[in-house]
Design a protein with these regions (language model features):
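Domain-level signal for soluble alpha/beta catalytic cores
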Residues: 1-113
Length: 113
């Protein structure tokens, strides 16, 4: 079971898995395509960060809004599946021992002030 993030933060410095997007690109994968076509590779990237000392993993949810998935791959009907897969890959990488966070990115719907 994942440790409580607030307890971890209260006790010490907590290391995250910086650079998931860039690491996926460096390994030759397109984001977010890797989520829908090769979740095992995504899980391996998370595992590598965890094995390197990351205590918290961030699900690779960049460009996973309906608008982005439609524009890039015609995957507008796969939004829930893609996001769930991204989260599950991060959770599985640590065997459930690390907390997993997500990110909110631009929805391109005018949400910026």
């Amino acid at each position: 079971m994942a440790k409580d993030l607030m307890q971890m933060l209260a006790a010490d410095i907590v290391l995250g898995d910086g650079g998931m997007f860039l690491e996926a690109n460096w390994r030759g994968y397109d984001v977010p395509e890797i989520i829908g076509t090769n979740p095992q590779a995504l899980q391996q990237i998370h595992r590598d960060f965890h094995n390197a000392g990351s205590q918290v993993l961030q699900a690779l949810t960049w460009f996973t809004s309906s608008a982005e998935l439609e524009a890039r791959y015609g995957w507008q009907d796969r939004v829930e599946e893609i996001n769930r897969t991204a989260i599950e890959a991060a959770k599985a990488a640590s065997g459930g021992s690390a907390p997993v966070g997500g990110c909110l990115v631009s929805t391109k719907t005018g949400s910026r002030a």
